[in-house]
Amino acid sequence: MDVTLAAGSVWTDPACPVARTVDLIGDRWSLMIIRDAMDGATSFTEFHQRLGIARNILTDRLRKLVEHGILDKSAATDGRRHTYRLTEAGQDLFTAVVALRQWGERHAFAPDEPHSILVDDQGRELPELHPLGQDGTPLSAEASHVRKTA
């Protein structure tokens, strides 16, 4: 499923993938909901308890993430509540969330300040993400550029 902008909304910069992504998921609460969905949260109550977000804001962000194709909403087994799960598009955000986390670990904490650590199923810390060129060499912003398409 492709992600879409809500009806009546306009892209900030229609030709830019970064701008479109920010239009879809760039606010603080949406990213935290996506992060917590990746960490196993599936219900309104779980998101609310983990985030401490106002209920009306949580309702709005969950609705938008479902509309945008990031989360799937389905009836819970009790039939009264709903569960939220990442769609394929939502799961594809994992690398972006890891990159944001790793940037935060490097730049948003003092050297000895404690913080959570993302680990794999064996308890090992994830390696640093680095974009690689076609030949396997590391890339930097200086070694790449945006090519505009018609």
Q: Residue spans of the language-model regions?
A:
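Canonical helix-turn-helix DNA-binding module
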Residues: F44, H48-A75, R80
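C-terminal regulatory/oligomerization modules of transcriptional regulators
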Residues: M1, V98, Q102-A150
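N-terminal helix-turn-helix DNA-binding core of bacterial DNA-binding proteins
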Residues: P14-A54
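Basic, amphipathic "hinge/linker" alpha-helix immediately C-terminal to the N-terminal HTH DNA-binding motif
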Residues: G26, T77-V97
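Alpha-helical linker/hinge and terminal dimerization helices associated
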Residues: T21, L31, H68, V97-H107
